[in-house]
Swiss-Prot record:
GO terms for MF: ATP binding; heptose 7-phosphate kinase activity; heptose-1-phosphate adenylyltransferase activity; phosphotransferase activity, alcohol group as acceptor
Gene that produces this protein: hldE
Record Pfam families: CTP_transf_like (PF01467), PfkB (PF00294)
Residue segments, region Ribokinase: 1-318
CDD domains named in the record: RfaE_like
Similarity-based family: In the N-terminal section; belongs to the carbohydrate kinase PfkB family. In the C-terminal section; belongs to the cytidylyltransferase family.
Active site: 264
Any one Gene Ontology cellular component term annotated for this protein: cytosol
Protein name, UniProt field: Bifunctional protein HldE
Length: 476
């Protein structure tokens, strides 16, 4: 299966679970302490990263999605540091601050790429009333299309059954990264993502793939799940659903440096993809591709849609789909570094017809990559008047992204794409119709940067206006 990249700007995910702060002290070591037989590290750098459920939220936000995070913290400096870091990454935090508990913090001392010691500052949260977290969930559920419950057995999910029931009552799917052998506590969830060790802790030793499928189906039926996604390390992943054939996804990892946080990445990409409307099998394929990227990085890590797109398609393949402006600029820079010629065009593309397809195919033939900039709904309304667009922005972009000729689709809200074009600066800017080159928005900027501008002919007899009039007139 080769999935297409969704528009993660349209995704909204609520993450509830055990939030943590990972701290790293890094420096060289060249001697042994005279006080004890331990190395002395001269700390030169320190780094802070959100961990646990906070890492899941950070992954959703890194894709461009709306991430809402609920969890338990202390009234302390680590809580402030965690909140500041997450909010700078556009994660919406709604923490329950408890005066008698510390924020879970893990301090790692590193030297020469090796971890010398880890110091944990934590106390498992216990006997915490359900109301503070449930009320925060209830306030956020109308804003999201998926819920992730991230369980590290630290106490934030003490009332997990109430959380599942609230989400299902709101009609929102619930994805759970489980901890421990008690799957009963997750009864009624949409999907669990156990790794192979966690799965075998519940069902016993798995002999082969057939045995995996049989035991997985039993788990689904016993605990009223809709699906299981079993992550299997070098063997990839297996998606199991009731009364459906299993989907085995081979690993896409090229090199494995660190599996830390890979489970967080899997469930974040899975939930974010489903929240954009992707079917479950395609969302799992995207999560599998994402896992292949992050295990090649050191420590808990996020990935961008550019990295995910390249994992899906390969850097030389047909395209990366819907993308935002910031990531487009980065992608174009990488394309130039590969020596690729980048072509750009723009339009409303309200009702895609044969003329559009001929035009885009012609534009794509003029270079190695084709960008299509699309007017948003508000922009189309100003240009075309009442009743337009017929199709909203996300649907128009989805159709364009499905064309083999198109690499990237990006929205713009202004009346013209001049600002966007001047930021991207394609190698070649093309426009269809009978324009003079001097009148094409962004043309002067492209030429000034050493690029070209061309006008392409439209196919005769094809127009969106003509199609709309024909429909109104009842003609086929």
């Amino acid at each position: 299966m080769k999935p297409t990249l969704p528009n993660y700007d349209q995704s909204g995910v609520l993450i509830v679970g055990d939030v943590m702060l990972d701290r790293y002290w890094v420096g060289p070591t060249s001697r042994i302490s005279p006080e004890a037989p331990v190395p002395v590290v001269k700390v030169e750098n320190n780094e802070e990263r959100p961990g646990g459920a906070a890492n899941v939220a950070m992954n959703v936000a890194a894709l461009g999605g709306q991430a809402h995070l609920v969890g338990l913290v202390g009234e302390d400096e680590p809580a402030q540091a965690l909140t500041t870091t997450l909010e700078s990454l556009k994660v919406h935090c709604d923490f329950v601050a408890l005066p008698n508990f510390p924020t879970i913090t893990k301090l790692r001392v590193m030297s020469r790429g090796q971890q010398l010691i880890r110091l944990d500052f934590e106390e498992s949260f216990h006997d915490i009333p359900a109301e503070p977290i449930i009320s925060r969930m209830q306030a956020t559920l109308p804003k999201v299309k998926a819920v992730v419950l991230s369980d590290y057995a630290k106490g934030a999910l003490e009332h997990v059954q109430l959380m599942i029931q609230e989400a299902r009552k709101a009609g929102v799917p619930v994805f759970i990264d489980p901890k421990g052998a008690d799957f009963e506590r997750y009864r009624g969830a949409t999907l669990l993502t156990p790794n192979m060790l966690e799965f075998e802790t519940v069902v016993g030793k798995v002999k082969d793939e057939e045995d995996l499928v049989v035991k997985g189906q039993q788990i689904i039926e016993e605990f009223d799940f809709e699906a299981l996604l079993v992550t299997r390390s070098e063997h990839g992943m297996t998606l199991l659903r009731s009364d459906m054939a299993p989907l085995h996804l081979p690993t896409q990892a090229r090199e494995v440096f660190d599996v830390t946080g890979a489970g967080d990445t899997v469930i974040s990409v899975l939930a974010a993809s489903v929240s954009t409307g992707k079917p479950l099998d395609e969302a799992c394929a995207l999560a599998n591709a994402a896992a292949g990227v992050v295990v090649g990085k050191l420590g808990t890590s996020t990935l961008s849609t550019i990295e995910l797109a390249e994992a899906i398609h390969g850097s030389q393949d047909s395209g990366f789909g819907i993308i935002n402006e910031e990531l487009l600029i980065s992608a174009v820079k990488q394309a130039r570094e590969r020596g690729e010629k980048v072509v750009m065009t723009n339009g409303c593309f309200d009702i895609l017809h044969a003329g559009h397809v001929y035009y885009l195919n012609h534009a794509a033939e003029l270079g190695d990559r084709l960008i299509v900039a699309v007017n948003t709904n508000e922009s189309v309304q100003r240009l075309k008047g009442p009743g337009r667009p017929i199709n909203p922005t996300d649907r128009r972009m989805a159709v364009l992204a499905g064309l083999g000729a198109v690499d990237w689709v990006v929205p713009f809200s202004e009346d013209t794409p001049q600002r966007l074009i001047s930021e991207v600066l394609p190698t070649l800017l093309v426009k269809g119709g009978d324009y003079e080159i001097k009148d094409i928005a962004g043309g002067a900027e492209v030429i000034a940067a050493g690029g070209e501008v061309k006008v392409l002919n439209f196919e005769d007899g094809c127009s969106t206006t003509g199609i709309i009039e024909a429909i109104k007139g009842g003609r086929g």
